[in-house]
């Protein structure tokens, strides 16, 4: 009986942000264990999937020994890219550059150019076939879950085709360190019984994933050694091969069309509607649109000296581990989300350094790429993104001096239907509401006070203005609110502005009563802050000599104030607030949502004012917030 052919693919992954020193130690151990394993079991053949930046942090002596393994055809390296790009969410040009740069690094450091591609999370796009073939890659490896149920266990490899272009594609059985079988041979035999491969053509591709994080995973190499020992004992029955050798020694089993899909867990099912889920998550669409926008700006850059370094940073930002939610990584984690925004803010600041107008800059653009317009105000220190279609709310507020998007608070409440900014669900800035005049902050925090208006669901008319003193946008809406089933007309005008070359953001509200009857109401506007220190004692609220530590866990309020401040010692920033007229300021605990919510995902602050308007009268309040830098602890996050 012919021996069964087994292609064993290992993929050490880095899904969490790690300090460079920790990553280097983990990489050194990876290559040392791999070299020792291959020397101890000379009949073993392995394929190893890696992002190219891992090689840049490897010890030179270890790389030299790995090159010796290449020479004796014991191991092959398979490419994920320079990083692990999210194919479905990234600009195609950026993904191509990522993969090409990865090939270049592999060639420079190992002397070998990979011929295989390993899409992270089996994130597959049919349109990538043409690109992979053009840059010299001849095969790809994806989870067998992407294949039709009647053939996914058939073994071998197939030919995937799209628009006349084709590539060899291996269906793999994915196992994680935590789910690796205790009896390797018995596990393989059970797979064989469930499969449909012909007796003389039995290629099984096993994809073993383990983490490079020494704090999260324990003992992945022990199981690797166990696997190698078991295969070595049964060499008469099982023949280990590299994937590149399997293509040369066997024929494709036929053609298969693999649609756009993704597998998010080792034993999960292929999800062909994963982008609908992704755009249902708060902040996901904003991150993606900012990535696309920054890439477009970089593409137009004429200063070629700065482009390669900035593009390399974008490779890390488009990494799927930052852009897809997971238990240990992804934009749902405060650290990952703020890291991604921070890196993109740094790139934008570098690009704007030589072209920012003296008084500031105004852009009116289709930022969401949905046919609408977004107003963007910016200067050297701040950049503000305003969605006039949904109540004139601010969905991003970049403090460039500290590389912080202060409006990137997150809620686990999903957007339904999927949308980039969801009215009433997204945790943005300046969400305006009208409440009954006797409403208290504590009652509102408990959810017992309904809103009488829908300002954040409707568009405002707008006009922009630039002068030597700064830039501003004026938004106006004739609307109404409801009291006892009666529509009460109201005119709302709000102005946002940036002062020239300063970290001062100003806001003005004017409410006009066009009716012939007096009105009495409580007007509120909500701001959701994202600080690195949210949920910890490093975040404090100041009012005069009073200090409130660790806000966000329970309700508290400041009454009749015109000045207060928020300190974030971890982020190194203090925000001073000032209003012309006294206001009440409410700080709310996490909203009760269907899933777990935590104070570290954002701080909700509401500015509330009771207003009495006579017929044809108006009310106006002017405010500003000033961002100032504090001493900041050192940043040791990640390799980018």
List PLM regions with ranges.
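Active-site and substrate-binding clefts of carbohydrate-active enzymes
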Residues: 2-29, 39-41, 156-158, 163-167, ...
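An acidic- and aromatic-residue-enriched active-site/binding cleft used to recognize and process polar
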Residues: 11-13, 51-53, 82-85, 111, ...
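Acidic (Asp/Glu-rich), glycine- and aromatic
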Residues: 391, 396-402, 411, 486-490, ...
């Amino acid at each position: 009986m012919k021996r069964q052919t087994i292609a064993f693919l290992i993929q050490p992954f880095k899904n969490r942000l790690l300090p460079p020193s920790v990553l280097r130690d983990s990489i050194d151990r990876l290559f040392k264990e791999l070299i020792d394993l291959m020397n101890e079991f000379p009949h073993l053949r392995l394929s190893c999937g890696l992002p190219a930046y891992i090689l840049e942090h490897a010890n030179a002596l270890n790389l030299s020994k790995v090159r010796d393994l290449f020479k004796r055809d014991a191991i092959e390296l398979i490419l994920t890219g320079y990083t692990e790009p999210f194919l479905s969410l990234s600009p195609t040009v950026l993904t191509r550059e990522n993969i090409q740069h990865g090939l270049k690094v592999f060639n420079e450091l190992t002397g070998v150019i990979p011929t295989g591609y390993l899409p992270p999370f089996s994130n597959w796009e049919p349109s990538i076939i043409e690109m992979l073939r053009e840059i010299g890659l001849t095969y790809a490896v994806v989870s067998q879950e992407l294949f039709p149920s009647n053939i996914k266990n058939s073994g071998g490899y197939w030919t995937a085709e799209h628009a006349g272009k084709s590539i060899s594609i291996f269906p793999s059985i994915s196992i994680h360190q935590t789910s690796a079988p205790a009896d390797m041979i018995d596990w393989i035999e059970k797979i064989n019984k469930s499969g449909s491969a012909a007796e003389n053509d039995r290629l099984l591709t096993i994809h073993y994933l383990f983490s490079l994080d020494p704090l999260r995973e324990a003992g992945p190499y022990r199981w690797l050694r166990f696997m190698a020992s078991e295969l070595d004992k049964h060499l008469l029955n099982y023949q280990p091969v590299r994937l590149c050798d399997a293509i040369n020694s066997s024929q494709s089993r036929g053609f298969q069309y693999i649609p756009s899909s993704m597998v998010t867990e080792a034993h999960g099912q292929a999800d062909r509607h994963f982008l609908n889920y992704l755009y249902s998550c708060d902040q996901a669409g904003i991150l993606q649109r900012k990535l696309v926008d920054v890439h477009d700006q970089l593409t137009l850059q004429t200063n070629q000296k700065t482009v390669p370094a900035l593009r390399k940073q974008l490779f890390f930002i488009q990494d799927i581990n930052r852009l897809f939610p997971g238990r240990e990584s992804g934009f749902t984690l405060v650290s990952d989300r703020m890291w991604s925004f921070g890196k993109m803010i740094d790139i934008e600041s570098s690009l704007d350094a030589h072209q920012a107008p003296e008084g500031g800059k105004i852009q009116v653009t289709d930022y969401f790429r949905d046919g609408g317009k977004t107003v963007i105000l910016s200067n050297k220190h701040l950049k503000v993104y305003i969605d006039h279609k949904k109540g004139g709310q601010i969905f991003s507020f970049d403090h460039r001096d500290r590389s912080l998007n202060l409006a990137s608070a997150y809620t686990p409440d999903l957007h339904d239907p999927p949308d980039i900014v969801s009215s009433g669900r997204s945790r943005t800035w300046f969400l305006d509401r009208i409440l009954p005049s006797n409403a208290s902050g504590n009652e509102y925090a408990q959810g017992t006070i309904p809103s009488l208006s829908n300002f954040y669901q409707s568009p405002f008319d707008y006009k922009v203005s630039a002068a030597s003193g700064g830039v501003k946008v004026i938004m106006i809406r004739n609307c109404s609110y409801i009291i006892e089933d009666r529509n009460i007309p109201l005119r709302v005008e709000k102005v946002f502005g940036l002062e020239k070359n300063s970290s001062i953001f100003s806001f003005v509200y004017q409410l006009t009563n066009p009716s012939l009857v007096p009105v009495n109401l409580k007007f509120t506007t909500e701001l959701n802050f994202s600080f690195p220190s949210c949920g910890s004692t490093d975040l404090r609220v100041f009012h005069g000599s009073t200090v409130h530590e660790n806000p966000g866990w329970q309700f508290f309020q400041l009454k009749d104030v015109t000045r207060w401040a928020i300190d974030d010692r971890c982020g190194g920033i203090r925000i001073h607030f000032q209003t012309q007229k006294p206001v009440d300021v409410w700080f709310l605990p996490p909203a009760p949502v269907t899933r777990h919510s935590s104070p570290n995902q954002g701080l909700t602050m509401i500015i509330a004012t009771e207003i009495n308007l006579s017929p044809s009268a108006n009310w106006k309040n002017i405010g500003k917030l000033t961002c100032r830098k504090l001493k900041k602890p050192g940043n040791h996050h990640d390799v980018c």
